[in-house]
Amino acid sequence: MSFFKNQLIHRARPGYRIIPESTVTEDIELGTIGEETPLLSEGVITAVEEGAIGLPEVAIGVAGAIGTHAHEWWRDRYAFKSVLTGNYTDLKGNPLKPRNAIPEKIKQLGKKIFQGDFNRAFPDNLKLETEKEKADLLRYYNHNRRLAGLSEAYPQGKGYAYAKSQKVLEAERRGLTVPGYKYLGPGNSLNRGQPINQIDEDAKEHDEAYDKVKTSQEVSRADNTFVNKALDHVVNAINFKETPGNAFGAAIGAIGIGTKQAIEKYSGVIYPSVSGMSRHINPRYINQPNWKDYIAEGNSKNWVGYSNLPDDFFQEETLSDSPMQEATKRKADSPAVETPAKKGTTGVNVNSQSTDPQNPSSSGATTDLDVTMAMSLPGTGSGTSSGGGNTQGQDVYIIPRPFSNFGKKLSTYTKSHKFMIFGLANNVIGPTGTGTTAVNRLLTTCLAEIPWQKLPLYMNQSEFDLLPPGSRVVECNVKVIFRTNRIAFETSSTVTKQATLNQISNVQTAIGLNKLGWGINRAFTAFQSDQPMIPTATTAPKYEPVTGDTGYRGMIADYYGADSTNDTAFGNAGNYPHHQVSSFTFLQNYYCMYQQTNQGTGGWPCLAEHLQQFDSKTVNNQCLIDVTYKPKMGLIKSPLNYKIIGQPTVKGTISVGDNLVNMRGAVVTNPPEATQNVAESTHNLTRNFPADLFNIYSDIEKSQVLHKGPWGHENPQIQPSVHIGIQAVPALTTGALLINSSPLNSWTDSMGYIDVMSSCTVMEAQPTHFPFSTEANTNPGNTIYRINLTPNSLTSAFNGLYGNGATLGNV
C-alpha cells in the first residue's frame, strides 16, 4: 500500500467532518460538526492505483452512483476537494479560518482537568493566572466537545465517555456508504440503526454474512446471494412490484459487487473490514525481538507520530481458499526485516487500531504478550526447535482443547384461561368470643386470587412430566384482562325491591398482599341463605384435589380434564376441560383479612391503601394487571446430583471461614408485641427431598427451602400474590335504613369475567463430566441442598417470609 493511498484512505473515513488528529485541529475554525460526508470507495482507490481493473469497470460503478445521488454528490463536492487536497473548507467552500494556537501549557492543563470526558460542564470557578489562559482553556474545551460530536450525536447526556466506551463514534465513522443508505457500501459497522429500505436490509445481511465467513468460498457465496437479491429488486421494479428506490440501490450494489469480484480475479479475496475487524500489525514484526520494545511503545501512543514504517507493517486480514483457519497453519520462515533503528519518525499520523492483547484486532493476529508467553515455555526458546528448524517469525500454534458445551434449553409455556369472579360482600365471620379468649376473626373481601405461584396455571400434566431433572422456572408472567361484569336483579319480586340497570360497580386489583401479613387466602364453603353474596364459612384454599361435599377436583382436572386411560372421572358429567375448550371456570380462593380478639392490635388495618380501583364501565376489555416475576430458586424438578471424587472421598471437616447462615431459622412466638420473641434455630442441610416438594402443585419459588451449594448466603424471598375482584353492589330497598340505622346487608347478585394470559419460561440442562454416567451431573457448587424446614404458604407472612405454622382450619 503506497503512502499516497494510505493517507487518502486515512482521511476518507466517513462520519463526522474529517479533522486530522494533530495540533492543527486546535488552530482552525471547525465549522459545522456532525454532518455525514460520503467519500470515495477504498476499493476503487486500490483498483485504480494497482491497475487491477480497467477504466470501463470503474466508470460503470462511478456513473451509477453519481446518476442516482447527484444532488448529494454536488452538495458535498467541497468535502471531496478537502479530502483530496488537504485544504479544508466548510460545505459551502469557504476556507476554514486560522486561529491562534492553544499553548501547550493549556493543553496539558485541559488533559488533567477533563481526562477525556467533555460531557461535564466547563468549570467556571477555575482560577488561572490570566483571563487569556482561561479563554484558551475554554477554547480547548469547546473544540474537543464539538469534535466528539456531543451536541449533535449524543444530546441526551450520553457524552464522550459513554461514546468512547461503547465505541459508538468508531462504529459511525467506519466504512463507506452510498449517500442515502446506512449499509449499502463496503466495510460498514453492523450497528448503524434500522436500514433505510429493503435493499439496505439486504446489504446489512450481506455485511453480517461477511462478519461470519472463514473461507473464500463463503465470501463468494455471500456476494452471489446479495447480487441475486439485487437483480430481483430490479426486475420487480420494472414490473411495478417495488418502488424505484430499491432498484436504484440494487443497481449500485450489484455494480459494486461486480467490481469487487473483478478486482479479486487478480488480487484474491479481500476480507472486508466489518464489525470491528480491521488492520493489525504484521506478525513477522511482532515476532522479531529487535522490534518488540518499539511496537510496545507505538501501541501505548496508538501510533500517533510514527511514520516511515514498512509498507507491510499494518496488514488487512485475508481469507484462505481452504476451509482451514489461518491460525492453524504453519508458515515458512520470514526473510530478514529492517530494525526500528533504521526507521525515522515525523509528525505524520498512522491511523491503526489498537493491538492491546485484551482487545485483539483480529483472530489471526499475534500480540507481543502471546509471543512472550510462548517463548517462556520449556523447549520453545528462540533457538532451533526439536526438528532442527528455526521457528522465529512463525505464528503461535495453539492446540484446541476438548470442550463439550451442553448448553441450556429454554422452553416457554403459555396458557389462556377464562375465569368468573363474584362481587362478594364484606362480612366478619368467626365463632363468638367470650371473656379474654383469643378468637379467630376473618373479614371477607371480593378479591379473587390468581394462582400464578402454581404450575398448573402454565402447563398441563404431560408438559410437567416430560421435564428432566434440574429443570427450573426462570421467569413467569400473567396478564389479567377485565372483560365485563354482570349485575342481576329480580323482575317479578314484591314492591320492596326495585329493578335498575345503572348501579355503580368497581373493579379492584392488588399485587403483593401476601407480603403484608394482614390476611390469607380462603375458599368459601357457605353463604347466607337469602343473600348469596355474603360468605358465612371458609376453609383452606383449594389448589389440589379435595374430597367431600365442599371439595374441588383440582386445577389440573379443572383446566385440562381427566386422563382417558385410567382416570375414573373421565366420563363423569361436567368434568370437561375448561382450558381445552376455552370455557369459563371459577377462581376458587378469595383474600380475607385475619385478626384475633383480645390481642391488643386495635382493629382492622386499612387494606384500601394497597388496592387499585377502577370504574368497571371504563375498563372493559382492558389489561388491568401485567406482572412478571423471576424466582430466586425456581427448581420444579429434582436437582442434579454431583459425583464425589478425589482423595479422600469422605472430605471430613472443611473450614469455610464463616457461619453457615443459610442453615438458620427464626422462631417467632407470643403474638403480643410486649412479649414477642425472635430466637435463632439451626438446621442441617440435607439431600433428602420430600416427594411433594417437586410435584406440580408445589410453589414455584423455593428459596426458603432450597439452597445452592453447601455454604453461603441465600437471602430467600416469596412470590407476590395477585388479586382481582368486583366490589359488592348494594340492592335498592324501601326499608328505613337511615331512620333505624340498620346495617346494609342486602346485595345484588354480581359477577365479573376475566381473561388470564399466563406464561412461564423453564430452563433445563443435562451436563455430564463422566464418560459412563447414566444421569446428568454437576459440581458441588451447583448442587441443591434442602433446609430441614417446611414453610407453609397457606399461612400469613411475617416480615416478607412464610413460617411453618399450621394452616387455619374451618372458620
Curated annotation (Swiss-Prot):
First-listed, main subcellular location of the protein, grouped into a coarse class: virion
Gene3D superfamilies hit by this protein: Phospholipase A2 domain (1.20.90.10)
Pfam families cross-referenced by the UniProt entry: Denso_VP4, Phospholip_A2_4
Domain comment, as recorded: The N-terminus of VP1 is sequestered within the mature capsid. It contains a phospholipase A2-like region and putative nuclear localization signals.
Keywords: Capsid protein, Clathrin-mediated endocytosis of virus by host, Host-virus interaction, T=1 icosahedral capsid protein, Viral attachment to host cell, Viral penetration into host cytoplasm, Viral penetration via permeabilization of host membrane, Virion, Virus endocytosis by host, Virus entry into host cell
Organism: Galleria mellonella densovirus
Positions of region (Disordered): 321-367
Record's protein name: Capsid protein VP1
Membrane-spanning residues: none
Domain of life: Viruses
Record function comment: Capsid protein self-assembles to form an icosahedral capsid with a T=1 symmetry, about 22 nm in diameter, and consisting of 60 copies of size variants of the capsid proteins, which differ in the N-terminushe capsid encapsulates the genomic ssDNA. Capsid proteins are responsible for the attachment to host cell receptors. This attachment induces virion internalization predominantly through clathrin-dependent endocytosis.
Cysteine pairs bridged by disulfides in the record: none
